[in-house]
């Protein structure tokens, strides 16, 4: 977002359209030409795209109310999740992302629902009716929030990639974004 924000400040005529969705939805929009870029937090083949991997990875964890007894733990184990009413990422469930992580506890996982975007799911957690398995930094867990995040242990992480179609002539604004994004990633190297 920093690179995009800088471009908007430097070029007042550049306009953006931010769309949220899961990886499948974003890939479809990219293929149909509805969007120029997609940010994917998923381990999947990127052979059909140009892509840049962002240096940071996203860590999975559990969102709960701050007054929940699990909030006292530094990390959440598979055993901690057994029999809890869980809301899981629809995409992660479809891709069997957690099968090896929770191992033989699979039958003890009480998945009461799935979500494609985290906002509505966190409302259920705030009501105390569910726990949310999601990435860190996707919910508001500031001091005034009643929610908190605890990472899963052992750690389960995902890479983040910015992707765009191959063999497509990009607009000048899109070319500028790619150039600046590459330059910003070089500072991490």
What label would you give each PLM region?
Residues 67-77, 154-156, 167-173:
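Short helix-loop capping/hinge motifs at secondary-structure junctions, enriched
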Residues 5, 79, 159, 163-189:
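Extended ligand-binding regions for polar small-molecule ligands
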Residues 47-53, 57-59, 120-167:
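Beta-alpha-beta core module
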Residues 3-12, 80, 95-109:
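Ligand-binding cleft/hinge of the Venus flytrap
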Residues 84-106, 170-174, 178, 188:
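Secondary-structure junction motif
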Residues 22, 77, 116-117, 135:
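Short loop/turn segments at beta->alpha junctions
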Residues 1-46, 115:
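Central regulatory/effector-binding core of bacterial HTH transcription factors
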Residues 49-60, 64-86:
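Flexible hinge/capping segments at coil-to-helix
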